[in-house]
Amino acid sequence: MAKATDAPLITELQLANWHISHPEIAEFLDSRDVQDQWESAIKDQGSRGRVLVCERDLALVGVAAIEFEGQLGQLSLLEVTPTCRRQLIGSRLLNAVADIAGRAGASSIYSWVATADTPAQEFLESTGFTHTGATRTIGFQDGASELLSDQMHMSTNLDNRA
């Protein structure tokens, strides 16, 4: 599980990855606000969710966050440092999240994935997630700027995971 001292590193990893995969969102994010949210999430770990990290050679290389809503677990974040991808870090984090969710009473895990984020979709599909058909657009329009992100809903049943 993540420690309070991990919040700045999680923020750095998330923002660096989002500048690559979600630049339209990343440009609007304030690093201090993101770090505050991670500090709060780490402090509040327990029955409502967990934040997991993966370290290699004392460096944070992956993070996953799960939130519980009754029998549902929401995978709210799964990020791996680009230079460490395809080394099973994401798979291990996702398996740990599934174990934690199952022990917390969840029967399935879902995630909202940007429709343009094909690598994330393919990764989740390779681990048993399927598209549910649900979509959403999130963001804001304030006259001066616009941020809209089209997302698709993906889920997996924990009973069917190997």
What is each PLM-predicted segment?
Residues 53, 59-67, 74-79:
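Conserved beta-strand in the GNAT
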Residues 101-113:
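Conserved GNAT acetyl-CoA-binding A-motif
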Residues 112-113, 121, 130-146:
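Conserved catalytic-core motifs of GNAT/GCN5-like acyltransferases
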Residues 15-40:
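Conserved GNAT-fold acetyl-CoA-binding loop/helix
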Residues 80, 86-99, 126:
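Conserved acetyl-CoA-binding loop-helix of GNAT-fold acetyltransferases
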Residues 71-82, 91, 112:
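Conserved acetyl-CoA binding element of GNAT-fold acetyltransferases
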Residues 39-53, 74:
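A short helix-loop-beta-strand connector motif used in the catalytic cores of GNAT acetyltransferases and
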Residues 1-12:
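A short beta-loop-alpha structural element at the N-terminal edge
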